[in-house]
Structure formats: structure tokens, C-alpha cells
């Protein structure tokens, strides 16, 4: 995501949620029975939340999701959706009950492995009690049918909410970082549980649907609607999942190394947007050279017909507002930033939100790497020295209120540059590629980065990272031959 400070809402205390979840065995109303009685099961309930230091109530324990199959029906004349999500997961222990994250939408039914399951709603959780316990290491499939009007989460510092957003013309888009996926499909809404996806979206025949991954088909039916099918075959964090619907012009081009580039532009600004985004292929080629092979089959941009004042690196389909279309390519840094996130954030995703600098620091530094590559007049070292004049607090543990603060981006990029100066270019660019290879399609932490950088360089780097990530004031940039 491009720089945009965000403030989150406090939520229900974990202990109250856990107590309520254990007590409920009913339908969509709290405390009401579903009519099936109380299922006799052994095992233990999955944890309520994954224990993320910033968002302890988000995500759920007891299982690991392998695949989401999301089906939606939408008519722009109405704000509501009809959905069905299949969730294939593996139990991490003998599981008697588990939770899914879902906001506002009405649950119509829940099945586990084809059998009707009891369920209840406890605030923004769906608590599922299968007919019999699910053994440890067993793979099981939960199917949730749901409907209603998606409600985005409030965000005081953004013109739009988090999650599902609907514009006045009926078009929709998704901007979910960090916890908005639960506004439109039931999920384990935490980046530590990545999964593959497929989407089947039914809309009127005159609408286009953009989503993650590979476009499989967009077949018309006899009722005047079209079903758009997309597949995301590489694991993806929930906050990067996106389905957007509206009237768009689709621009397709062949990118480097066989990557398909597919952009979705509003018709009235499509020509201008095409010019502004025309260098995506060049950026893709350069980043592939320095970061390693592009980790997905396709890439593109979705430009929505409203101002967003931020952008988001939805996996394979980055999101931009129309305010990033100007006709003079002034948004090139943001375009480079979101593309770089496909490696740093999408391919390799932080295990916990406190390590957000791993996303934003590297993506911001990638902007400077692009200009250093593309513009002979650009002075990278002078630019980085100039940035050290800014007052930027610690970023190793920024707190949820400063998750997307300027410090995370700029001090993060300075940390990356300090690392480069310390270990030298050969080790640094080896690190960029190895990071994306070793942790491909998975999660990593700051500790993982330090360990890998030390292994490659042969240097002890804990002191360097402590100073740049955690000290109240960061030190001067090292010189290339100064060690730390």
C-alpha cells in the first residue's frame, strides 16, 4: 500500500468472545439454537484469533486454510450480494469447533464435509460446530452460504472504508489491508494463513469483473448475465484477495518472460490511464532482473472511478484510484511501488503485522531503485541522505495506529539502504533474490531477514537493525566501507 496513516477500531475483548463462542450452538442469532440440538463432539475448539500483537482477535486457530472457492452474484442496481464460499482446510489438532471471520453479512447455512453443521454469530465471528470432531491433520471442507449488503469497516483517514466498497454507479472494489476481507467472504482473515483461491462471479452481461490471478473464462448464460471465473494458484493472504465489478475497458499486453499484463480502466479516462501505466512492462523486466522471477502468471492495474489517495497491491491486480491518472506519469513512483509489492508483501508476506516494514520499506526502496536505473540524473545516495533529515520514529514495532505511517515507508527504505551499504551490492542483490526464493508464497519475519543477511554477508547485523528499526533516532547512513 502507498503511504496512508490509518487508525483502527477497538473490538470485543478476546475473553468475552471466547466465552460466548463456547456457550453458543445455534443459528445466526446470538444464543439461539439452530434446531439441530447440541452436537456431541470431542476435541478442543480452535482459538479465537491467532494472537497477532496488533489484532489479536483477527484470524482463528485450530486449522490452516489451503483453498478458498468464492462464488458471488451481484447486480449493480442493488447493494446486496449472494455468496457461497468453500473453505478447504487442515485441522491443526482434534477440532470440536472453529471460527470464521465475517462482518455484517447474513449466514444462510453452513456445512462441513457435506453435513449440516451448527453455527452461531458472535460479533464478527461465525462459530462452527461440526457434527463430529475433525481429527488432527485431517483435511475438511466448510461451505458457507450467505447474503446481504457488505459493510466496509470505518477508517477515519480514508475516503473509503476497508474491505468491500460500492460506488454510486453500482461498481464495486475491494481495499482490505489489514483486515477487510471479512467484509465480503468468510475467512481466516490474517496474513499468516495464506491459501489458493478461485472466484466465480455472476454479474449482468455489460459488466466486467477484475480479480486475482488468471482469467479462466467469462461466459454468458441465457439469463443475460455472465460468469467470470478467475484462479489464483499461488498462495495469497486474505487482505490481498479482491473482486471488483463495473464498466471497464480491458487493456491486454504481453509482458516480459511470458507474463500477461491486463489492466482495467474506466472508459472515460482509459486512454490517459493507458499512457500513465504504459511502462509497467519495463518495470516488470527490471524488477525481475534484481528481485528474481516474477512470482505469478499475470499482473495488471485496476483503476476505479473515484479518488482513493492510496493504492493497494492486491495480488496480481493492484488497485488505484482515478486520482493516480494524470496524463503526465507523475504516478510512476506509486506504480513501481505496488508492482514491487508483488515480491515484497505478496510473494513473501509478514508473519505478523508488526513486521509491516518488510513490505513497505522494500517497496519504497524499489521506487528509488527504479529511478536510479531509469534516470541517469537521479542520485540515489544523495536522495537517501536527504531523507535522513526527516523526523521518523522507530518502525520495528510501530503499533497499529502507525502501521502505514510515513516512518514505516521512509525509515523502512533507509533501513534497506543502510543494509545495502553495509553488506555491499553483491551480497545485497543476492539477498533480494534469495529472500523471494526461500520464502516464496509463504511468510517471514524480521528475524528471518537478519539471519539470511548475516548468512550471505558473513557479518553480524543485529546492531545495525536495532539501530535502524528500534532506536528513537536512527544513526547516520554507513559508508560502503564502514561496516555498521
Role assignments for model-derived ranges:
Residues 24-294, 421-423, 463, 467:
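Acidic/His-enriched low-complexity segments
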Residues 233, 354-423, 433, 439, ...:
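Acidic/His/Gly-enriched intrinsically disordered linker/tail segments
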Residues 163, 273, 290, 294-295, ...:
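Catalytic zinc-binding patch centered on the HExxH motif and its immediate surroundings
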Residues 128-131, 186, 266-275, 325, ...:
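Second-shell loop/turn segments in exported
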Residues 2-29:
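Secretory targeting and sorting signals
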Residues 175, 203, 208, 251, ...:
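Non-catalytic accessory/interaction domains
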Residues 192, 317-380:
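Zinc-dependent metallopeptidase catalytic helix centered on the HExxH motif
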Residues 295-313, 356-362, 378, 382-384:
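Short, solvent-exposed turn/loop segments enriched in Gly/Ser/Thr/Pro and often Arg
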